[in-house]
Amino acid sequence: MSRRALRRLRGEQRGQEPLGPDALQFVLLDDDDAEEEGPKTGLGGRRPGGAGKEGVRVNNRFELINIEDLEDDLVVNGERSDCTLPDSASSGNKGRAKHGNPENKQDGDAAAKAGSSEQSNASGKLRKKKKKQKNKKSCTGESSENGLEDIDRILERIEDSSGFSHPGPPPLSSRKHVLYVEHRHLNPDTELKRYFGARAVLGEQRPRQRQRVYPKCTWLTTPKSTWPRYSKPGLSMRLLESKKGLSFFAFEHSEEYQQAQHKFLVAVESMEPNNIVALLQTSPYHVDSLLQLSDACRFQEDQEMARDLIGEPAYPHLLPMEKSWCRRPHWSFYLALYKQMSFLEKRGCPRTALEYCKLILSLEPDEDPLCMLLLIDHMALRARNYEYLIRLFQEWEAHRNLSQLPNFAFSVPLAYFLLSQQTDLPDHELSSARQQASLLIQQALTMFPGVLMPLLEYCSVRPDATVSNHRFFGPDAEISQPPALSQLVSLYLGRSHFLWKEPAIMSWLEENVHEVLEAVDSGDPAVEACENRRKVLYQRAPRNIHRHVILSEIKEAVAALPSDVTTQSVMGFDPLPPVDTIYSYVRPERLSPVSHGNTIALFFRSLLPNYTTEGERLEEGVAGGPNRNQGLNRLMLAVRDMMANFHFNDLEVPREDNPEGEGDWD
């Protein structure tokens, strides 16, 4: 009988039986054991089976794969524990022994018992080592915590001495600042997705997965694919100091940006938008040019282009927290934020516009150069964030006297009333909000009686005879108020009158109007005190209110501006700059005409004041000097412009029948 048939009868497979005493027996040694018993190895580097510490005998080479994983798991604190083959290897040996002779079976059982005893010893050693490791970890953890506390103390000392601080996250119990800006609400797409869903907002704008491009986004705006590639525009921010969690920055213009600013001022004087477009081709992120061109597009009713041009100036900027408002370079940044906020409100994103309003106010809350306090109440009501408006009024009334502004005097009670109309609040909170709303609206009507009749006229509501004929709310109340107060009232009514058109609000307002009339007829001393206060407080509006009125573009408020403001030349990129404006660089003046110039050039300069030869213009870093042909071309263009403006009147040729030109007199 052949060996193949004999193996089949025994149930064995080829390659599993041992070929010899040391043919396929490999011994796995630890590194330390291998070093100690290295000289004792026999020929071929093999170790005898029963010498010293028993290693792992492997009859199948593929069992070595599982042993590597076992060795990695049994490494504790850099030491290796004694172990045997894994269960899979031992079970495999047992399975093969069952099909063999009885002697092999007995040998397999003995090996299994020995393996189990060795495993128990190894597990006991592992438990002891784990306990030691836990003790070591606890000791090292305590020492590391003490080290971190020492590091924190050192950092606090350094911050106190240098003035620099690294603000950490506030504790959970602390309340956020009233002007805290939530970055997730600065993205208008987030608000639009909440209203209409992501599919309706994005639509076909979703790029394919393979063609997806991830541009560098900022908190203020998200760049579009149609925008020019961003490069260093020459506008940078320098950290002045960091103190008590606030960072103070200063905007700096490079030399190239200053040259672009000079070209922009020349383009504005030319009154030609195409010159600004040509400037943007070389300086695509020049802020003043983008603001001016956005206004030109808005006047031409191209709202989409105007909104994109406003978003570009905010792209390269970070969020500054600066105190020096009178510094000229960042004036454009304020205007860009304000105009972007206006576009967001018109787009139907009042929650995002409220965050922009908080951002602008947080940059300079004391000075408030754009007078955002005249607008933040309107944004809060439009966003239906009544709790925020009430909180702002409660925290700032003590030191800012917000009740002296007509917009806060009427918006805060309106917020209380709208809050009392919500059904998800308890009954006692609803009743207290209604009482507070009635109390505040009566104080507002007593302080500003000239608001009622124009408000009812805006809402197309005709008051009853007792109100319209009363002297307190009659026409005299509107005429007798100071001009500065008239500006504030016109600004508030032109912006927020539609918030009062609901029937429930009008019925509530009517009740409180009658309460005020009863107090006036009864001779309440608060009425006379409010009248005296109006005469003292509203003598003349400050410059930031005039600037806010110009930026708002509300016709009624602009018409109420004083004559000294309306007669000034107001530029869209620089409306009513502060009186104490500090210019970081001075625009070079044009060269005055010289007497020894060319006679033809002097003649055309007398006819065309804007004409200048190439030699008289400043050389803005152009290598090679001016070209003579360019001066000749400018001269020819000036001649053509002059000839195009000439108009010749043809003399009447006398008729043949009346050669002397004598006519009959009627």
UniProtKB/Swiss-Prot annotation:
Pfam families, per database record: Tcf25 (PF04910)
One GO term (biological process): rescue of stalled ribosome
Superkingdom of the source species: Eukaryota
Composition bias, Gly residues: 41-53
Start-end of Basic residues biased regions: 125-137
Keywords noted in UniProt: Cytoplasm, Nucleus, Phosphoprotein, Repressor, Transcription, Transcription regulation
GO cellular component annotations of the record: cytosol; nucleus; RQC complex
Compositional bias segments (type: Basic and acidic residues): 100-110
Modification Phosphoserine occurs at: S592
N-terminal signal peptide: none
Protein's cellular compartments: Nucleus; Cytoplasm, Cytosol
Statement: the UniProt record of this protein carries the keyword Phosphoprotein: yes
Region described as Disordered: 1-59, 79-146
Predominant place of localization: nucleus
Record-linked InterPro entries: TCF25/Rqc1 (IPR006994)
Family: Belongs to the TCF25 family.
Record text on subunit structure and interactions: Component of the ribosome quality control complex (RQC), composed of the E3 ubiquitin ligase LTN1, TCF25 and NEMF associated with the 60S ribosomal subunit. Interacts (via C-terminus) with NFATC4; the interaction leads to suppresson of NFATC4 transcription factor activity and is reduced following stimulation with angiotensin-2. Interacts with XIAP.
Function (record text): Component of the ribosome quality control complex (RQC), a ribosome-associated complex that mediates ubiquitination and extraction of incompletely synthesized nascent chains for proteasomal degradation. In the RQC complex, required to promote formation of 'Lys-48'-linked polyubiquitin chains during ubiquitination of incompletely synthesized proteins by LTN1. May negatively regulate the calcineurin-NFAT signaling cascade by suppressing the activity of transcription factor NFATC4. May play a role in cell death control.
Protein name: Ribosome quality control complex subunit TCF25
Organism for this UniProt entry: Rattus norvegicus
Gene: Tcf25
